[in-house]
Amino acid sequence: MLLAGGGGVVRLGALGYFPAVLVEEARLGPPPGRSSSPPPRGVLLGLHPHGLICSPLWLHVLPGGAFRARHGLEFRMATIRFNFWIPVWTDVLVALGFIVASRSSIEDNLRAGNAVGLVVGGAEEAAAMAVDRFDLVLRKRKGFIKCALRAGAPVAPVVTLGENKIIRQVLLPPGHRLGAITRALFPFCQRHLGFVPIVPYGRPFFGGLVPASVVPFQSRLVTVMGKPLPMPEISEPTQEELDHHHERYLAEVSRIYNTYKSRCGLVDSPRLRFVA
C-alpha cells in the first residue's frame, strides 16, 4: 500500500513537471461493467522508444491503479532478469507489478488476461537515443510478436514523442580512447547483464553554474497508445507468419509517429527509422 501511494506521488509530481499528454486510441479491456467467460486474453504493449527513463511507465501506467481503472486489465511490466538480482529493489519491482522478460512469463500473463508492457528496443535502443534522431531497434526484433501469436493476444504499440529529449547522454567523438573502451564493453554488458554503460545528464542549474544534473529537461512528451492489432492464436508460427504480423506492427508504429508528430505540433521531431 505504501509503495502504491508513493508511486502515485511520483506520477503526480512528474505530470506537474513535464508538459505531458496521453492519447489512448482505444480501450484495451472489455467494456466497463461487462464480464466475459472465459476471461479475455491480455494485451501486449510494445513501448517505444526505450529512452533512458522510459517516462510513460512512471507518468501514465504504473502508479495508483490508473491503468486498471481505465482499461479493466491488470498491468505487468517485463524487465531484464538482472533487476531481480538486486536486494530490496526486487521487492519494489514485485510490488509495482514487474515480471521477468522471459517468453514463458510474458505468455503466461497474456493467457491470464493481463496487459504486459515490454520495451522492445532494450539496452541497444537506449544507447542509440539522441536529440537529433529517433531510431527504434525493431527491424529484427520479432520475439514479442511470437509471444503474442502463441498466446493469441493482440499487440498495441505505445509511442512517446519527446522521450529522446528529456535525458541525454554523453556522446564521445569517434576515435576517443574512452569511447572505444565503452563501445567495446557494449556487447558484453548487453549479452550478460542486459544493459550498456551510458553516462546520462539532465538540465543545468543556477544559470549554468552547474552545467548538468540528473534532473530531466522539461521537454514536451506526447504518449500515444495505439489500437490493439488482433493476433491469431498460433502455437508454432512459421517465419512467414511471423514476418507478416511484424510488418503490420511496424506499419502501425509508423502511422502513430507520423500522425501525431504533426497533429501535436512536434513537426521538428526527427524522422523515425527502424534499425537493427
Language-model segments: what does each one mean?
Residues 1-9, 37-112, 122-140, 180:
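Catalytic core of membrane glycerolipid acyltransferases/transacylases, capturing the structured
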Residues 11-38:
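A short, well-structured juxtamembrane/interface segment
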Residues 13, 91, 146:
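Surface-exposed charge patches
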Residues 22-32, 62-64, 102-106, 132-133, ...:
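Eukaryotic intrinsically disordered and solvent-exposed regulatory patches
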Residues 108-276:
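Non-catalytic C-terminal accessory region of glycerolipid acyltransferases
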